[in-house]
Amino acid sequence: MSHKIMAINAGSSSLKFQLLAMPEGEILCQGIIERIGLADARLVVKTATEKWQEITPVADHREAVTLLLEQLINRKIINSLHDIDATGHRVAHGGETFKDSALVTDDVMAEIERLAELAPLHNPVNLLGINIFRQLLPSAPTIAVFDTAFHQTLEMPAYIYPLPWRYYHELGIRRYGFHGTSHKYVSGKLAEKLGVPLSALRVVCCHLGNGSSVCAIKGGKSVNTSMGFTPQSGVMMGTRSGDIDPSILPWIALREGKTPQELNQLLNNESGLLGVSGVSPDFRDIEQAAENGNQQAQLALALFAERIRATIGSYVLQMGGLDALIFTGGIGENSARARAAICNNLHFLGLSIDADKNQHNATFIQSEQAMVKVAVINTNEELMIARDVMRIALPEPALQEVLA
């Protein structure tokens, strides 16, 4: 039996969505409502055969969801709201409470709200989206899918920071990790393509986009990941610095009189590829500038690759070897130059890539003599969300082995 599942990612001024037929995974429609709260908000909807957009005032998220549901009916994508069997919502932070996706209840909503102090920019609006869909689709189960849940398998030495113990015990300061839904999806897809159980593999997954993270996966479980207490930490990103010497911050504060809020702005929005290159946070713009001889752009690309290489190396050491390296995300899936730079001179790990396969974005780009598989896999977080919805909200025994 096929079910219609809506996957939702609610942002501060946007609402991304996919309606999928499950368990087939067929996308019935997908799109975004952006500039919510403004008179010129934009709705974009795509199906397999057509695409349309509409510019219209959208006062708030409730109006956005109402507009979306009306469009689905008016365009005959669904006959009525009862056609939507369940909804799945990306939630940025599940803390230590949620080790898996969860059926939303009043208690679950209260806990997501409590955890908003760990993700003040994301959890409140994620919760808002959940609440609106629960009100407008009261008969459809709602599932919260947490970006942090996949990393709850980290052992304590991998997630504790060397700070006074009370900061963890009383305030919950620890490594949480993010991009978990993506890392979970692509590692499972890798095992499927190889015809090998994920439990038998040691994998490093590089989710590289405007936000980037690296994850070590052993036996199908996350054992380390580069993002930490916040998505700001780890490797260099589009506008985020990643890991730096923490004493730089009080030094800058004293030297330039910056407030904590200004320091946060510096680290999150003015650093990374943008900060070093002075060109753009967009990897394509930096690659073009580097090809045109811009030395700062060239340095930014080199630094980006070097930080990722160092992280890969530490994870290989932790896992005692490597069976496969995955590239995913906007940069990982599309930049042959980035993949080549990251894989350069890793022959000692049994890892080398075929230049032609890499240039043409083949699924497997390792050279014939390589011992380590190198895969380029398009992430699909919406499908992973829909699978979790099916597993938790609409369990059918015959499907559980497929969806596991």
Swiss-Prot record:
InterPro entries: Ac/propionate_kinase, Aliphatic_acid_kin_short-chain, Aliphatic_acid_kinase_CS, ATPase_NBD, Propionate_kinase_PduW. GO terms for molecular function: acetate kinase activity; ATP binding; propionate kinase activity. It is an enzyme of class 2 (transferase). Pathway: Polyol metabolism; 1,2-propanediol degradation. It is found in: Cytoplasm. SUPFAM superfamilies: Actin-like ATPase domain (SSF53067). HAMAP family: Acetate_kinase, Propion_kin_subfam2. Works with phosphate acetyltransferase (pta) to capture exogenous propionate and regenerate propionyl-CoA during degradation of 1,2-propanediol (1,2-PD). This is Propionate kinase. It comes from Escherichia fergusonii (strain ATCC 35469 / DSM 13698 / CCUG 18766 / IAM 14443 / JCM 21226 / LMG 7866 / NBRC 102419 / NCTC 12128 / CDC 0568-73). The lineage of its organism: Bacteria, Pseudomonadati, Pseudomonadota, Gammaproteobacteria, Enterobacterales.
